[in-house]
Amino acid sequence: MSDNQSWNSSGSEEDPETESGPPVERCGVLSKWTNYIHGWQDRWVVLKNNTLSYYKSEDETEYGCRGSICLSKAVITPHDFDECRFDISVNDSVWYLRAQDPDHRQQWIDAIEQHKTESGYGSESSLRRHGSMVSLVSGASGYSATSTSSFKKGHSLREKLAEMETFRDILCRQVDTLQKFFDACADAVSKDEFQRDKVVEDDEDDFPTTRSDGDFLHNTNGNKEKVFPHVTPKGINGIDFKGEAITFKATTAGILATLSHCIELMVKREDSWQKRMDKETEKRRRVEEAYKNAMTELKKKSHFGGPDYEEGPNSLINEEEFFDAVEAALDRQDKIEEQSQSEKVRLHWSTSMPSGDAFSSVGTHRFVQKPYSRSSSMSSIDLVSASDGVHRFSSQVEEMVQNHMTYSLQDVGGDANWQLVVEEGEMKVYRREVEENGIVLDPLKATHAVKGVTGHEVCNYFWNVDVRNDWETTIENFHVVETLADNAIIIYQTHKRVWPASQRDVLYLSAIRKIPALNENDPETWIVCNFSVDHSSAPLNNRCVRAKINVAMICQTLVSPPEGNQEISRDNILCKITYVANVNPGGWAPASVLRAVAKREYPKFLKRFTSYVQEKTAGKPILF
């Protein structure tokens, strides 16, 4: 055959020097870098089956290895300066190893390189060694039959390809042998036919011989054997045709079985790759979808700073998104406030307490009258309507106070128009839903009972602007526009913006009053009344939406008589608080959002403020 030489280029005839056999297994002690704390530690290292494994010690091999790496794609790097060290890296995993001496290191490197080389696909010695698993013997006289059961399904495609190469060599030699046999047979047949034709021609020319009795004598069997002798073709005496045929059949069966297994392996790999491709395709689809959604959200957010995505008559943000954004902004403000309060507490305990009291020491339960001024706003004074300083809003203040004393103290628990929205201990918050021209004007009323403080103390802290920032967390800034009297001022304040809602500002008159009891059994009552007014010093501006308010903090002090002749202490006093708020927020915020914010923020304000008053008055003289 013309291709016989090329087909046999990787035949089974091998030079003994090149056939080194399988790589030698190796084991021994090497120092391995563990970490920067423990440094180099001796480990028992085993090199076997193209895998490098290490154990803590030789005695602990039965407990399993501490780690192992496959050497197929390993990179072995001798250290440039340390003659005993070499590194083995596979992807991101790196082993730092040290041998006893440079020769020991070189022995390990050579052994590892040998395992790595023998693990590679396509090496000549690897294919020859794999082909030797086929139990077919090449010889001139015949080949042993090979059962297809010897081709185990567990072999890899690489091994099966090596077997196919061995089968190819065997089959080529078998074909050559059979071709020689057929050529010899053909030559013998052609010579026999030529000789037969020649003998026949000679017989036709000869005369028959005569016997003694006169009869003719014809040549029969004897002459035939001489004329047509049994000729054995030259060159086929040493060939067992039947054996060659059986071996050829076994070889072709082996090729078909191995080829079938190769196809099966390729189909499995194709299925595996198809699954991986499907998985990667699905991942890509998800990533593209997530990217698309992220870009959509990013485009949204890029426009959220514009006027179309803020509170307004033509806002593009829907009610649900509006509520979520407001809630998220309030949560952030709460976290900032918690951090601020924690810092204040830390600074409070790290510094010494100032001497003196915020309140004037006036005894334990006797009320002393003294002039009221903003500089001593926390001092006690009996503020009654008759002693108020007259100013241009006096009649308006009087009307507001009388309305609150008449209507705000009424019990609304049984009124069907009022809804109980929050109840936490002594605190109850009611709301009555009112809308006017699409604007939420829900009146709100809260009742609370606080122990250890008086109504005068609560109202003073609520009215006094000097301590406003200590408990008020929703104000961005404020200032007193005008002082009308010692107990009445006009305040302009700007509230912190809660995106996407517009920022609000408020201009209001704040007045504090003491309402004298009609009889000695009635509780002492203090009131702070805040209601919106106009002032030339604080005109409307485009930056904020001006809100209108009518708020009252009404506090009544209840005293339980102490036992015996003991003086009244804070354990004997209770402040009953009624807080009412009528707010027109203005703007275009959704009604559901305003109601949800009010339900959330009003109880928080009341708890925070009353806790602040209790904290500030603890241990100080009682101010009735």
Swiss-Prot record:
The modification Phosphoserine is found at S126, S132, S135, S315, S373, S377, S380. Residues 1-11 have a biased composition (Polar residues). A motif (FFAT) lies at residues 321-327. Its main location: cytoplasm. It comes from Bos taurus. Transmembrane segments: none annotated. Residues 23-117 form the PH domain. Residues 1-24 are annotated as: Disordered. Residues 263-303 form a coiled coil. Shelters ceramides and diacylglycerol lipids inside its START domain and mediates the intracellular trafficking of ceramides and diacylglycerol lipids in a non-vesicular manner. Keywords: Coiled coil, Cytoplasm, Endoplasmic reticulum, Golgi apparatus, Lipid transport, Phosphoprotein, Transport. An N-acylsphing-4-enine binds at E472, Q493, N530, Y579. It catalyses: N-hexadecanoylsphing-4-enine(in) = N-hexadecanoylsphing-4-enine(out). One of its GO terms (cellular component) is cytosol. It comes from the Eukaryota. SMART domains: PH, START. The modification Phosphotyrosine is found at Y372. The lineage of its organism: Eukaryota, Metazoa, Chordata, Craniata, Vertebrata. It is found in: Cytoplasm; Golgi apparatus; Endoplasmic reticulum. Residues 389-618 form the START domain. This is Ceramide transfer protein. Phosphorylation on Ser-132 decreases the affinity toward phosphatidylinositol 4-phosphate at Golgi membranes and reduces ceramide transfer activity. Inactivated by hyperphosphorylation of serine residues by CSNK1G2/CK1 that triggers dissociation from the Golgi complex, thus down-regulating ER-to-Golgi transport of ceramide and sphingomyelin synthesis.
